[in-house]
Amino acid sequence: MSTLHKVKAYFGMAPMDDYDDEYYEDDDRAERGAARGYARRPREDRFEEEGYIDRAGREYDDRPAPREYDEPPIYRGGYDEPRFDPRLRGPREFERPAPRLGALRGSTRGALAMDPRRMAMLFEEGSPLAKITTLRPKDYSEARTIGEKFRDGTPVIMDLVSMDNADAKRLVDFAAGLAFALRGSFDKVATKVFLLSPADVDVTADERRRIAEAGFYAYQ
């Protein structure tokens, strides 16, 4: 429709039906043109306009499935911990190798050690301990033997290791009373090992220590 014809129709100088028909024809042509333009656009442009394609240009159906991890990664100090491998593990303190048997030879010390040279010095002729004897009572009934040896002037070592605690305590009380009655001395040498010394035998603290170190009472 020309501009002049539109002006005439507006002021009633031309029929309105012609104006309406041409108006609707223009609208139909515009809609058909838009439809043809939409159909001619690439498939990706149409999908992107309607929201079916993401920003990376991939269709939703083409997205890879998320990876599945067997186990979550472990972080310590800002980096991934290496996989545990027993071969790479260093020695732990409680897994120290056992010492060789050869290293234990000659390592006995204290009351269980026996030095022949010390034994000779302790019990050389003329020494107060030259006639010492060791008794290993099994029960309290052997207290009489201990008393007789001590009464005859013989130093006695009482080894009570094999006795139960009750009988050992009774025998210790007996020996202490015996030493007090005969003016002797009663000394502990090692665990459950005691020395009864007569009044005329003076055993110094150093000699008692050497007796314990020599450990001769365990071998007599």
Curated annotation (Swiss-Prot):
Per the database entry, which stretches of residues form a coiled coil?
none
Q: List the disulfide bonds.
A: none
Concerning InterPro entries, the annotation shows:
Cell_div_SepF (IPR023052), Cell_div_SepF/SepF-rel (IPR007561), SepF-like_sf (IPR038594)
**Entry superkingdom:** Bacteria
Quote the Pfam families the UniProt record gives: SepF
Q: Where is this region: Disordered?
A: 33-82
Indicate the principal place this protein occupies in or around the cell.
Answer: cytoplasm
Cellular location of this protein? Cytoplasm
GO terms under biological process: division septum assembly; FtsZ-dependent cytokinesis
Its biological purpose is as follows: Cell division protein that is part of the divisome complex and is recruited early to the Z-ring. Probably stimulates Z-ring formation, perhaps through the cross-linking of FtsZ protofilaments. Its function overlaps with FtsA.
Give the record's subunit note.
Homodimer. Interacts with FtsZ.
Which named protein is this?
A: Cell division protein SepF
Native organism: Mycobacterium sp. (strain KMS)
| Encoding gene per record | sepF
